Amino acid sequence: MAKKSAIETNERRRKLSQSKAAKRASLKAIVNDKTLPIEERFAATLKLAQMPRNSAKIRVRNRCEVTGRPRAFYRKLKMSRVALRELGSQGLVPGLVKSSW
């Protein structure tokens, strides 16, 4: 089980990145638009730099929904391999059966 503080920090980052995503995308579009004057692009760069670091999507870490484990994460299932194995052996994951041949 991951530390509660790490899970909460990640959730705060996720919420902040979702709320600031539109503003960040518009500023990035201005910065990358080569047809605009350099002063306007530089001003957008400064505004982008003044935004909170945790509002960047890259700061969000994929974590297991069950245990909070940050590694060995399956995106499709939103859980780690350890949790998947435990729940699968209990028969709680639909369609997952223990292999036998």
UniProtKB/Swiss-Prot annotation:
GO molecular function: rRNA binding; structural constituent of ribosome
Region (Disordered): 1-24
Gene3D superfamilies to which the protein is assigned, alphabetical: 1.10.287.1480
Ribonucleoprotein listed as a keyword: yes
GO cellular component: cytoplasm; small ribosomal subunit
Subunit field text: Part of the 30S ribosomal subunit. Contacts proteins S3 and S10.
Family according to the record: Belongs to the universal ribosomal protein uS14 family.
Protein name: Small ribosomal subunit protein uS14
Organism expressing this protein natively: Azorhizobium caulinodans (strain ATCC 43989 / DSM 5975 / JCM 20966 / LMG 6465 / NBRC 14845 / NCIMB 13405 / ORS 571)
Higher taxonomy: Bacteria, Pseudomonadati, Pseudomonadota, Alphaproteobacteria, Hyphomicrobiales
